[in-house]
Amino acid sequence: DGLTDVWPPGEKPVFISCGPASCDASLLDWSAPQNATIELAAANLISEQGSDLIAALQTWQPTLCLHFDPQATQAMTTGVQCRFIGFDARRFNLAQLKLLAARTRSLGIGIAFNVETAADFRACMEAGMTAASGWFFTSPTSAPAKALNPGQANIVRVLNLVRSNAEIREIEAALKQDIAISYKLLRYINTAGFGLSCEIQSFRHAVNMLGYDKLNRWLSLLLGTASKDPMAPALMHTALFRARLMELLASGLVDKSEYDNLFITGAFSLLDALLGVGIEQVLDAMRLPEPISDALLGNGGRYQAFLELALASEKNDGQMIAEQAAMLGLTAAQFNRAQMQALSFADAMEF
């Protein structure tokens, strides 16, 4: 029921996985919102508790994504209606996916999960999948450039000016070199839910209302918008998710003055993929606090554990997540809530 608090009914669809473990009819004690899709392994429908689960599903009729496994053929004869059918891209080759997509098309919308490379993504779509899910886009696919492009370099200059508390007129002069930067910055601030009583109209207005520290975190997002990579929107969404998740996970564990730095650490964690430039080169051009640089370079420091937990959340490894969360003293409920809040936050942003 906590899902409704952070992902209100009527918002974008969200998939909720039951994981590989078995589940039973008690799952339906939860009244899933209409925009929530429950991911369910086919084996659950023919397990010892399968008949009770089937009866509950037919009574409540939640939106389902049935994950195809060796028991799927039998599970599909149970009468349970599925909107989606999920296929693990690691288990099937291209020919198998084509055959399965054709055979199950009338039973549900085909989605490929655990897609590991851009080539695998293209293959899944060519095989007849309607959509594909994976984190393949977070890894740079080409050799890094030797330097930042002019647009990226100007954003770094603005960031350095804000971090050093430069005069507003000096920062405004830098912003005027690329009007799109000011536009994007104001759009981010006005859609980010600061709870402001008025719309921010200019950089000077933003400084007066928010202060340099808060502005610094939103300026950090502009580096990603300078990317021309077709995967940039997905990368930006993921960077925002990591940024907000790290901030939420650290709540009560670090001083509040460090929240913005944790946000920036997450936001910058995909700069190499977004900018096509090695992370070392980007950091050399910026004046970042040492804990941020250390975490991004994998050198440890007090932000490293929060970044590692954010990265673990993108892997289908419950044990790894549990171990990382336990190291920080976080319960499963705390982690799950922070994860959904971060996802909702990233989804609300406009790129």
Describe each model-derived feature in a short phrase.
Residues 1, 6, 95-351:
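Conserved alpha-helical "signature site"
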Residues 1-56, 210-211, 234, 252:
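Bacterial c-di-GMP phosphodiesterase EAL domain
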Residues 19, 24, 32, 41-42, ...:
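Short, solvent-exposed coil/turn linker segments
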Residues 30-138, 258-261:
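The catalytic core of metal-dependent phosphodiesterases that act on cyclic dinucleotides
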